[in-house]
């Protein structure tokens, strides 16, 4: 063991000389073997056999040679990176984004959504928006907006058209074979021009006669209200004239006597008949002499 200098600090553990009296985790491994280092660290008992260290690069190489190979990343592929197409179709012959290939387009497989090819895009099994190909948009089973055999409304519809021959073109499904009522981009066919013109003429005629009928009705109501108001004016005017005439006659001393009450005709049960328009009318009387021993002619002026 090294001598301790006077007045100095004690030696550090790694400055001490190695001994075999017990486990020492700080023994320098340069002069010992792996087994000695493990034994010195206290992780193995004295005399225990420790396996030799493992060569990790060789082990990784052996594992890779014996196990399943790692597939190539998308960016490691040869045709990756052309707009949108290489990533999904490079192994199938893809060369462009929405474009062609042997079996597909940008989204690959049978009946791709965008693009053409031998079986892609508008293919035998029909994509959505693709171009032509060996079994293209007017192909054997094509002709639809969203896929399937014979278009979206099914059947062999329009899809049986130009691909297999004009003889089967419109026979299996007619012009409605490729229409989808749920597709907002697939509008129904427009009606003929003469039918649109006829409907516009009918609409104009109906609007014209409707306006004329409305004006006639409004004018009729206005005339009815005018005549009702005029009759009420005459009636109220007659009543006003009667009141004024009575007042003037009273001022002149002319007394009116009530009209003799006529017995209204009675019905079979003793009840008066309806609609008696001339009952209880007043007639004019001549001037009367003053009552004897009475007041002047102004007495009972406002009386009856």
UniProtKB/Swiss-Prot annotation:
Keyword Membrane found: yes
Protein name in UniProt: Peroxisomal membrane protein 13
Residue ranges, annotated region (Disordered): 1-78, 258-304
Keyword entries, A-Z: Membrane, Peroxisome, Peroxisome biogenesis, Protein transport, Translocation, Transport
Cell compartments where the protein resides: Peroxisome membrane
A GO biological-process term: fatty acid beta-oxidation
Species of provenance: Arabidopsis thaliana
Bilayer topology: Peripheral membrane protein
Protein's gene: PEX13
Biased composition (Polar residues): 19-44, 56-67
Family, as annotated: Belongs to the peroxin-13 family.
Subunit structure: Interacts with PEX14; forming the PEX13-PEX14 docking complex. Interacts (via N-terminus) with PEX7, but not with PEX5. Interacts with APEM9 (via N-terminus).
Tissue: Highly expressed in pollen. Detected in shoots, roots, stems, leaves, inflorescences and emasculated postils. Strongly expressed in both male and female gametophytes during fertilization.
GO (cellular component) term, any one: peroxisomal membrane
Record field: compositional bias (Low complexity): 262-279
Function: Component of the PEX13-PEX14 docking complex, a translocon channel that specifically mediates the import of peroxisomal cargo proteins bound to PEX5 receptor. The PEX13-PEX14 docking complex forms a large import pore which can be opened to a diameter of about 9 nm. Mechanistically, PEX5 receptor along with cargo proteins associates with the PEX14 subunit of the PEX13-PEX14 docking complex in the cytosol, leading to the insertion of the receptor into the organelle membrane with the concomitant translocation of the cargo into the peroxisome matrix.
Summary of the knockout phenotype: Lethal, when homozygous.
Superkingdom in the source lineage: Eukaryota
């Amino acid at each position: 063991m090294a001598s301790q200098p006077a007045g100095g600090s004690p030696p550090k553990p790694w400055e001490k000389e190695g001994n075999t009296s017990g486990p020492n985790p700080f023994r320098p491994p340069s002069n010992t073997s792996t087994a000695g280092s493990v034994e010195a660290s206290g992780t193995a008992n004295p005399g225990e056999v420790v396996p030799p260290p493992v060569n990790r690069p060789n082990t990784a190489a052996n594992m890779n040679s014996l196990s399943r190979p790692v597939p190539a990343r998308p960016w490691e592929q040869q045709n990756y990176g052309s707009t949108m197409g290489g990533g999904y179709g490079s192994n199938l012959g893809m060369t462009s984004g929405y474009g062609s290939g042997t079996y597909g387009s940008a989204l690959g497989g049978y009946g791709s959504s965008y693009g053409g090819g031998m079986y892609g895009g508008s293919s035998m099994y029909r994509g959505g928006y693709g171009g032509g190909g060996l079994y293209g948009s007017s192909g054997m089973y094509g002709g639809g907006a969203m896929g399937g055999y014979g278009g979206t409304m099914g059947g062999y519809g329009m899809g049986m058209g130009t691909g297999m021959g004009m003889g089967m073109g419109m026979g299996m499904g007619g012009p409605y074979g490729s229409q989808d009522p749920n597709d907002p981009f697939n509008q129904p066919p427009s009606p003929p021009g003469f039918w649109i013109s006829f409907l516009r003429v009918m609409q104009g005629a109906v609007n014209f006669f409707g306006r004329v009928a409305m004006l006639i009705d409004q004018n009729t109501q206005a005339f009815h209200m005018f005549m009702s108001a005029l009759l009420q004016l005459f009636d109220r005017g007659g009543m006003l004239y009667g009141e004024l005439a009575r007042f003037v006659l009273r001022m002149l001393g002319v007394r009116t006597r009530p009209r003799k009450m006529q017995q209204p005709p009675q019905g079979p049960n003793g009840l008066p008949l309806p609609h008696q328009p001339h009952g209880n009318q007043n007639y004019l009387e001549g001037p009367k002499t003053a009552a004897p021993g009475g007041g002047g002619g102004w007495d009972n002026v406002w009386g009856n």
